[in-house]
Amino acid sequence: MDIFYINLAKQIHRREFVERNFAAVRRPGWGLSRIDAVTAAAARDMPGRIKDTEKACFQSHLRAVEKAQHAAGHVLIAEDDMLLGEGSLPAVQGALAGIAEDDWDILFTDLIIPNAGPMANFYMLRQRLALSGGSQLIDLGNLNFAGATAYIVNHRTRRKVLQALADGSPLDLPYDLQLRKLIRSKILRGHVIVPFPTSVSAFADTSQIQETNLADAVWTAFRRLTWLERDIDAAMKPLAIQKAEPGAEAFARLLTAMQSADYKKK
């Protein structure tokens, strides 16, 4: 499978990191190609209400999806803050083996889940799957999600994906939210692999598109905790200085206790 990663020409350090990371975990049959990202200046005059940086991001992903039309098989499209581990590529292959090619258009390998309830469900599912060493595909048709750091485009339906995204409409939603809209409206079929086969590198802590705030830090920590090869201490470090109010901290302890093997449902 080919990985197409999106990268601005001036972001040399990000490019070098992606290429070193891929070289360290590469498996037979996998390749890596760079997609030259569209700049905010080049996207400025495109119609739509979103910011110029978001327009540029949208057009960069479209450029990658267009290139995917000519690939030999499925393509993993990634931003240049994607992180691969030793088990990432085998995990992707294992997940693909578990779903018929006619049943999906896009498979995410990492996502933002912005709401606490579904976030907890994902975490508990990851815990269960870690014990069995398996993975599970979650249908995104009715789920609130965001992010487009890494996702696989089905070679059988790639034309459909491109046509849905490049329909000539003004760019009024960021790329990830447009994907979510298309999936929730059943125009595209999207799933996410759990545990997440990929994660985000340290570059994700300094977004090129939006300012980082507490919500971003929480979502990034969740993504790293749901990763197949998570490092709990590293994932939580950016949140170490956050002080929870007493009630929230107490409730968090209840949830922690419910994760114990000694906790039995009645």
PLM features per residue range, with description:
Residues 1-78, 82-266:
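An acidic/histidine-cluster motif and surrounding catalytic segment
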